[in-house]
């Protein structure tokens, strides 16, 4: 099920977020955790890609466990700051093969002491969103920042980048954490 179908209802949705284990870990315990969490009947479960891509190898495998074993809509995170375009294309192909249609496309944290972007990397999440959209019928989400992205000089600049994400194919947005509801309400009225 596409997340936009869930999010376009008046119902309150509760979701769970999974952090895959580090590379080389055994997945049996994590698959049991997925089953235990699925028994709670969340509207969907998201699976992170890992800070700087460190746990990215298991994202698709756990999202597959969520969707195809436990029959809960899965939202696979995909970050591009620490991945080449070839790696991203490979992940997108895996998602298609496993019929995981919901993707949260993020730039992610830039690895420390790294030249970024390299010629074979995406600079912005909007570029990643465009490529995901061009490679399949995915339901793509993106991040938004009610208090402004730390790298944006102004909130207006941040809203320009937000529009670029939507224009590239982003269908829903999720906020970073905020502590003042008025800031979020003002942000959504400006957006």
Where in the sequence are the language-model features?
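Conserved small/polar residues in nucleotide/adenosyl-binding loops
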Residues: 187-191
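Hydrophobic faces of well-ordered beta-strands that scaffold small-molecule active sites
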Residues: 14-16, 45-47, 74-78, 105, ...
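Alpha/beta enzyme core
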Residues: 27-44, 92-103, 122-139, 149-168
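N-terminal amphipathic alpha-helix/helix-capping segment at the start of soluble metabolic enzymes
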Residues: 1-16
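Glycine- and other small-residue-rich loops at beta-strand/loop junctions that grip anionic moieties
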Residues: 48, 55, 77-80, 121, ...
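Glycine-rich, positively charged N-terminal anion/phosphate-binding segment
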Residues: 3-4, 27-35, 52-72
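Active-site mouth loops of central-metabolism enzymes
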Residues: 16-28, 75-86, 143-156
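Active-site-adjacent beta->alpha loops and helix N-cap segments on the catalytic face
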Residues: 54-63, 85-87, 112-129, 179-186
